[in-house]
Design a protein with these regions (language model features):
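Sec-dependent N-terminal signal peptides
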Residues: 2-28
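Secreted/luminal cysteine- and crosslink-motif detector
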Residues: 10-11, 69, 312
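Alpha-helical support elements that line or immediately flank enzyme active sites
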Residues: 488-492
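Conserved, function-critical positions that sit in or immediately flank catalytic
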Residues: 647
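Short, structured secondary-structure elements
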Residues: 65-66, 118-361, 436-474, 478-485, ...
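Signal peptide processing junction and immediate N-terminal pro/mature segment
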Residues: 20-49
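Short, functional "switch" segments adjacent to catalytic/cofactor/reactive centers
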Residues: 39, 43, 51-53, 58-167, ...
Length: 688
């Protein structure tokens, strides 16, 4: 499809591109056109770039023929100064007020460019519960807290989202793909009052749900073949990916998953995937205590939502966490040592294996090795270091004692006589109510954009209870303390059932509120959840939604270990992916780069020029959406494309412009331009 000659109708572009001129640039560097084709992170086992799906380099003049002002792009300025690439690290996102205001501004910018809701999108059944501050008026646990709090604050909530928007939103959130056109129409036509809950059950029990949440927990547990400290190899990634996938598919309780991560035994990380979690948390280049400390910090962040536990692994909290954490400011380094001591008798050891012409390693875990093999792991946490990645560990800091016995700092308990240390730690962590709070809050953030505690990995244990509020000037950390407590209690009572928790969240009226808001919006209301905050789709979601809607299924060869994949949500890791399209939407590497939601010029260029899009909008591709639709009338074709790509009918203005365009010039070319434009619209790129 040619765009270089400026064929694309300006009026069509004006209507179909919802531009809001908003571009994040917290930290940027200028890159030239010759750097657009960045390959994926290269390693010894990286698969080759696939030409059919790779980004194609185009001139800035070509890019200028499409309206990319949605990403804040001015093509004349781009031609003069190059393109800006967002670069942000995990540590940049600690300012929760800043995060909230960015989300709120983004939501206002996006929703201001969405089309007005057509009459056909009106809800066809009574859904509104009675308003009031009586929790008994609300059947959903979440609504019993959200709506009385809104009433007390004097903040009117947004109205309920339409059926068209709901099916798209919940399908993306639960499965990582947009819904099929026929499913949209059948859902909207259904007049039964329980159709939303039945749709939720359908999605939660789908194979695509397993794909989406295997990717999510792979991110959370940082399942990668290589990080800055250790190499787990693709076989290790695949083994852990399979363990996560099987755990979710079989409904394994989340506390059991956590116990297996902490207490796993095995000799081969290529066969027992959970081994890779502890191994991946190792720290090389220093004494064995560095390994133990890093694994302890990983456990605190992933399972307790307390990343700042890592801070007291180097020093007391005083002078470092005073303004950040009421608990942390008084926490002692010796408490970290007590916690780390649970892992002090666990050694990760490597076994060399030859695969083809290369030598690599698989890992095993063993407790208290035979004397003479590795004497470091025969005792409790030892205070005998002056070098390494952390400050000295010396007896003087612990009353002259040379070892520190294991004590779980939040309960004061240690292992029973003869009890395996890691088994004892697994029991302490999963019976700690903070484990349930963290699990619930991590998932809440995925559905609402921000956590009840936000950031979700920075819990302060002394600021969570509204019945025991912290002393001034400290304030309660959760936006809704009672909701967080009751939701965590419900999670425990229902057997740590992840599906049950998600079902409660998406069936709540709070989740089903519109992202549009009538009246003046105050960004401080974000934490009241008075409207749905928008989010940009993950790179994997965009890829799979384009693939599904177009009907053109790719065949990616990820190499001998990972095999062949068609869907990005099934890629075993995020560091190595076969298409740059996904990487440019900031999917992270599960190490130092977290998954981000920012937008960038690079993303705009991908949506306009990458083969993932352009190869799927051509009328000549017999397997494609257009080739299968060109026998329709113009009216039918426009409706069909909008429903297939955007899960809604076009507005009257959109339809009039699109039909007029199809009636002039070459119909096939105009149809290609229309489909290409839909893939570049705000309401395709964002989940709202």
């Amino acid at each position: 499809m040619k765009r270089t000659s400026g064929v694309l109708c300006c009026t069509l572009a004006t209507l179909l591109f919802s531009a809001f001129g908003f571009f994040y640039a917290r930290e940027g560097r200028v890159i030239g056109r010759d750097q657009l084709e960045r390959g994926p992170v290269r390693g010894t086992q990286d698969p080759p770039e696939l030409n059919s799906e790779s980004a194609t380099e185009h001139s800035t003049e070509e890019a200028g023929n499409a309206d990319c002002s949605f990403f804040g792009a001015d093509h004349d300025k781009i031609a003069a100064i190059g393109l800006r690439e967002n670069v942000r690290s995990r540590s940049d996102d600690r300012n929760q007020a800043g995060r909230g205001s960015r989300l709120g501004l983004l939501t206002m910018q996006v929703t201001s460019k969405l089309p007005s809701e057509p009459p056909s999108a009106e809800i066809k059944f009574p859904f509104e519960p009675p308003y009031g501050n009586d929790p008994g008026n609300y059947t959903n646990l979440i609504d019993r807290h959200i709506f009385p709090a809104l009433l007390t604050a004097g903040v009117p909530p947004a109205k309920l989202t339409t059926d068209y928007e709901f099916i798209r939103r919940v399908t993306l959130d639960l499965t990582g793909r947009i819904p099929m056109k026929d499913r949209v129409l059948s859902f909207v036509a259904d007049s039964s009052t329980d159709k939303r809950s039945r749709l939720v059950d359908e999605l939660i029990n789908s194979p695509e749900w397993v794909d989406k949440w295997t990717m999510y927990y792979g991110d959370l547990f940082q399942n990668t073949s290589q990080n800055t400290q250790m190499t787990m190899y693709q076989q290790g990634v695949l083994a852990m990916n399979t363990w996560i996938r099987d755990s979710l598919a079989n409904g394994k309780p989340y506390d059991q998953m956590a116990r297996e991560l902490i207490s796993v035994q095995g000799t081969d990380s290529y066969q027992v995937g959970q081994i890779n979690w502890l191994v991946g948390g190792s720290m090389g280049g220093g004494p064995y205590q560095d390994h133990v400390d890093a694994r302890t910090a990983r456990m605190g962040q992933h399972l307790l939502g307390m990343a700042h536990i890592n801070c007291i692994g180097c020093h007391d909290g005083a002078g470092h966490l005073d303004a950040l954490s009421l608990w942390g400011k008084d926490a002692k380094r010796t408490q970290f040592w007590q916690l780390a001591s649970f892992l002090s008798r666990t050694e990760a050891y490597a076994t060399n294996i030859t695969i083809g012409t290369s030598t690599q390693q698989f890992w095993g875990l063993r407790e208290a090795p035979t004397p003479g093999v590795n004497n470091n792991y025969l005792q409790d946490y030892r205070l005998n270091t002056t070098t390494g990645n952390r400050p000295a560990r010396q007896p003087a800091a612990f009353g002259g004692r040379t070892t520190v016995p294991p004590v779980y700092v939040f309960s004061g308990r240690g292992p029973a006589a003869g009890e395996n240390y890691r088994a004892a730690l697994a029991g302490e962590v999963t019976s700690d109510f903070q484990f349930a709070r963290a699990a619930v809050n991590y998932l809440w953030k995925e559905f609402f954009g921000i956590g009840i505690v936000d950031p979700p990995d920075f819990f302060d244990p002394l600021r969570l209870d509204e019945n025991n509020p912290p002393p001034a000037p400290w304030t309660l950390q959760p936006s809704h303390p009672a909701l967080l407590r009751e939701l965590a209690q419900d999670f425990v009572s229902n057997g740590y059932n992840v599906k049950d928790l998600m079902r409660k969240i998406v069936n709540s009226r709070a989740y089903q509120l519109s992202s549009r808001y009538n009246g003046t919006w105050n960004v401080t209301w974000e934490r009241l959840f008075a409207r749905k905050l928008v989010r940009r789709m993950w790179g994997e979601e965009l890829h799979d939604s384009i693939v599904q809607s177009s009907g053109i299924i790719p065949n990616y060869n990820l190499g001998t270990i990972y095999g062949t994949k068609s869907w990005a949500m099934q890629f075993p890791e995020t560091r190595i992916v076969p298409t740059q399209f996904v990487k440019d939407f900031m999917n992270g590497n599960r190490d130092e780069e977290e998954r981000l939601q920012e937008v960038s010029i690079q993303q705009a260029l991908n949506l306009m020029n990458n083969g993932v899009v352009t190869s799927r909008v051509t009328a000549s591709n017999a397997a494609g959406l257009l080739a299968r639709s060109l026998t329709m009338t113009n009216d039918e074709l426009v409706d069909h494309l909008f429903l297939t790509v955007l899960s809604r009918y076009p507005t009257a203005a959109e339809k009039s412009t699109a039909v007029t365009s199809l009636q002039t010039g070459t119909r096939n070319q105009k149809a290609e331009q229309l489909l290409w434009s839909l893939y570049n619209k705000v309401d395709f790129i964002f989940n709202y």
